[in-house]
Structures are given as C-alpha cells and as structure tokens.
Amino acid sequence: RYIIAWKLCTTMKTSDVTETLDLALQASGCDQAHVVHKPRLLSDNGSSYVSGELAEWLGDKKMGHVRGAPYHPQTQGKIERWHQTLKNRILLENYFFPADLEAQIEAFVDHYNHQRYHESINNLTPADVYFGRGQAILKQRERIKRKTMESRRLQYRKHAA
C-alpha cells in the first residue's frame, strides 16, 4: 500500500505511464538492483496500458504485465480505493495552479504513507510495512497491552480487597 511514486499529468499517454514507472523503479532501487524477480505491472485495460509502446518499454525493463479483467475494477481494488481517497481529499478545496494541486497531493501521499493507520494491515502505516518495521511495532504493542492488563488486574485486586 506504500505509494513509492506518483506524477500529476495532464494526459494519460503511454509516456506518462512510463515516466511514472521510471520514478517508481528509481525510488525502489529496482532500476539498479540485480533482482531475481523484477516487479510486474498490474493495470486495467486503458489505452495507455495496452499500447505497443508500453509493451516494448516493459520488455526492455524485463518486467511482466498483468491486466485486470475488463469491467472488473476489483482486480485493482487497492489502487482504486487509494484514488477514491485521494479524490475525496482533493475535492475539498479549489486549486488555481498545478503547483498548488501537486503540493496538496504530495502532502496527502506523505500523510497516507507515514501517518494514516490502515486497519487492513493491522493498524500500521504503509511505511511501517514497506520498510519492514511492522512486526517489531506489533510486538511492542503486544508488550504494552500485556503490561497494561497486568497493571489493571493489580489495581482491580487492590480495589476489591
């Protein structure tokens, strides 16, 4: 769920997709790392995703491409939900310049990645999971919960006696 790259575009051309994918590969380090399994692109069947230009670009990068079933947005459920959440936030204000909109999106992505807890990932932030801190945080929460319960039991026993 961690958003590693995004780009505000005025069109939905294949070049916009490849530039955004380049940003994602650079941010993740996959553009320079020697990995056994390159990332795969999961997309819908929009014109920019079914183009020969994108297929060639993915081939050059040795990346796979999985397309969701037509008229079945649930395949891309996580990113569709993210787009809906972003859209709901963005529509709260008016933006008169693209730079204002970009700044708001950047702030939202930072909040989404680092501050917003997700129930579906054990109330961790996407950054916690992406950077491998999730298990340590969950163990720490469990220790705190155990100590709190012990403290409450002790207080209850003192009060009951």
Q: Which stretches of residues belong to each language-model region?
A:
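C-terminal domain-tail junction helix/linker
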Residues: 59-63, 84-161
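RNase H-like DDE/DDD metal-dependent nuclease/strand-transfer catalytic core used by mobile genetic elements
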Residues: 2-111
